[in-house]
Amino acid sequence: MSTKPPTHILSIHGGMTFKTQKDYLNFLKNCQIKLNKPKKWQDEYLTNELGPKFEIIRPTMPLKENAKYADWKIYFENYLPLLNQKFILIGNSLGGIFLAKYLSENRLPKKAVSVYLVCPPFDGSLSDEDLVGGFKLKKDLSLIEQNAKNVYLMFSQDDDVVPVAHAEKYRQKLKTAKIIIYKSKNGHFKVSKFPEIVKMIKGDLV
């Protein structure tokens, strides 16, 4: 008896963009290096909680600390032909607006089961970061909802990077997407566990 292939999850991490090379070099000069990195919900936790019915693919996107949309688009498209018939897309932070932009401007070869945009910025009105590098969204985002059976956007009221007001901006552009606002996800979803998304992903296949 043949076994069903796993549902692929293509998970796009966050990143940063800078207006100038000088700003980027200044960031590199002053960034704090941590040898012991905190555990993130999208890493081993997600793999362990979802189990063998899912296979998580985590591309290392080009130059994540000085990201350019055009670079990410090329690299992302290399993965699309490799995905199984059933697949889910997750974008975290900059990865979220990357998916929002890509899916609003391009039709996928095959429809995703679900798309999860976790704390995605909508525009450049951020607390202390620039949003440049070609990630600006166009006015019409309707194609996002045509590219997936389910679209979820997740925000936190205590997010200190992407203000929760960005949830309403997306709400005005999307008709059927489910927008979820949590009271607290330790700021910019800096949590080691995320049981809500695990339950939702498992529910996508029911």
Residue ranges and their predicted role:
Residues K101-S114, D123:
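Conserved hydrolase catalytic core segment
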Residues S2-K53:
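Short, surface-exposed "cap/lid" segments of acyl-processing enzymes
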Residues G124, Q157-V162, G187:
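Acidic catalytic loop of the alpha/beta-hydrolase fold
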Residues I90-L99:
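Gly/Ala-rich beta-loop-alpha elbow adjacent to hydrolase catalytic centers
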Residues K185-E196:
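Catalytic histidine-centered segment of alpha/beta-hydrolase-like enzymes
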Residues N147, Y152-F155, D159:
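Short beta-strand/loop motif that positions the catalytic acidic residue
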Residues G14-G15, M61, V115-S125:
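Active-site nucleophile loop of the alpha/beta-hydrolase fold
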Residues P163-Q172:
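Short alpha-helix in the alpha/beta-hydrolase fold that links the catalytic acid
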